[in-house]
Amino acid sequence: MTITQVKIKKLENFSGSLPEYATEHSAGMDLIAANEQPITIKAGAIQLIPTGIAIALPDSFEAQIRPRSGLAVKHGITVANSPGTIDADYRGEIKVILINLGKEDFIIEKGMRIAQMIIAKYERILWEESSSLMETMRGSGGFGSTGV
């Protein structure tokens, strides 16, 4: 497995620990809330939650912000734009867009694990316009065409 070093900056509102892998085979690192005061996410509402960190990803890398399964299943708290994308040239604070799909208001306390971040390599492409595409068995079938 290749290890890539990424620069991370603690901002003024940072508290707690840097994102880290929970187990040897974890794909994601937990992101920690860095809000000064508790933030209430009302049922059905969306809130932007600060993490107190900024990162400098190498070229051809992105950070994906994804929900934590425990928050989703127990409280209906998930990432509204999942996965959120942090581009390699972004240098601002990483913030997480959380939505409360539950029936009860939910309070985000400082230091709470609110999402997970996955660092992923990607490739850029060039479009090649074509008047036709290679046929496949699936063709244009989508939205459940291969079964439920």
From Swiss-Prot:
Pathways per UniProt: Pyrimidine metabolism; dUMP biosynthesis; dUMP from dCTP (dUTP route): step 2/2
Function: This enzyme is involved in nucleotide metabolism: it produces dUMP, the immediate precursor of thymidine nucleotides and it decreases the intracellular concentration of dUTP so that uracil cannot be incorporated into DNA.
Name of the protein described by the UniProt record: Deoxyuridine 5'-triphosphate nucleotidohydrolase
GO biological process: one example: dUMP biosynthetic process
The family this protein is said to belong to: Belongs to the dUTPase family.
Known catalytic reactions: dUTP + H2O = dUMP + diphosphate + H(+)
Main EC class the enzyme belongs to: hydrolase
